[in-house]
Amino acid sequence: MGKTLYEKVWEAHEVRRLRNGQSQLFIDLHLLHEVTSPQAFGMLKDLGLKVRYPHRTFATVDHIVPTHDRTEPFQDPLAQSMLEALRHNTQEHGITFFDLGSGNQGIVHVIGPQLGLTQPGMTIACGDSHTSTHGAFGAVAFGIGTSQVRDVLATQTLAAQKLKVRRINVEGKLAPGVYAKDVILHLIRHLGVKGGLGYAYEYGGSAVEAMDMESRMTLCNMSIEGGARVGYVNPDETTFRYLEGRPYVPKGAEWEEAKKRWLAWRSDPDASYDDVVTFRAEEIAPTVTWGITPGQAIPIDGRIPLLEELPEEERPVAEEALAYMGFQPGQPIKGVPIQVAFIGSCTNARLSDLREVARYLKGHRVKKGVRALVVPGSEWVAKRAEEEGIAEIFREAGFEWRNPGCSMCLAMNPDRLEGDELCASSSNRNYKGRMGSPRGRTVLMSPLMVAAAAVAGEIADAREVFGVVGAR
């Protein structure tokens, strides 16, 4: 019987079985940022240990950096100390660090693929829950905690429990105006925020195969919001077209050999899965969240569910969400006023995201009273967007064009909500207080839907605001 990509990668990287049932896995690529690494380096120092394989470890700064004014020292002394600690630790241990102004600084899950560090068949670890993003390339990528960051630094291995594999097919063709962000919100809505517990998600089907790599990254990025620690797509020619020529990818004859090797990681046609579910692409509409979990989502033309329509176990969280968001059961989501619009994060801050929005935003203006930010995912993305005139389109429309970083996705930098502001956001989490204010509200949606909300001043259908649009 054939094997899944997950099984092949696991078996190839398994060093040994541990007594507790876990496996010790070799990690091909370890990505670091400034928030979860200082304590890990401190523990390493206390133990008198060095980084085992510095050449397999790469770092950047993203979570705490201001996106408006990056003049040092930062106004936040804690943020400045985190940056300085990362500079010191990477220099001391001989680790490549993509610092501010290097041309390659950015959100860790944007720069890994962008530089070609992320490759098929790899095991990848990072002290960040959205490490599953890298699975878009056919890698098995884990988000890990600080003590595990220490372990990987010291041994280049990780103790992990083998997961079951669920195949998620999305068949058919996405309708105009429907994007990968809508797909993953739709999947989480139907499978649940805990539906993926104990599973790795393998995404496939004709709609996924038709996606470009940056759309696949969006899909895999939010696997963790659906409870799955790992999400991946089998590598194919789309993967290779994206990777070819990137700085850390093999060149010449080695490139041809790498492609053959990478194709062998694909799940076999007769692979056995622990579960298989299928969705029709045509049934997926532009989707937005209405509550305080990514699973509390509805189509843009939908209404917030009545409590009696929900399974009994979901009602307490729904009641909590309604109270926090200030919504009513049965209320249409379209037309809800917004105060802030945010395009960015490791989910949707790549060049293709910005290109797609600029394509339709040109000639439109942000509604008076709406604060709109666009934060490129990396310095490379920002530079290309400037060169292509994308940044100017955003500026002319009334968006603030910021420097790269995690920005409003989380409350670790100056970009925050105030009071009970409602933010239309292309990020991945809508938890209570996620954007800094204990009363701030987040509604998740695709980047183009965020732009539509910014222009309309309310949650709106991008297909109506901008006219007929094409799927990507």
Model region roles, listed by residue range:
Residues 1-472:
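Fe-S-dependent hydro-lyases/dehydratases of central metabolism
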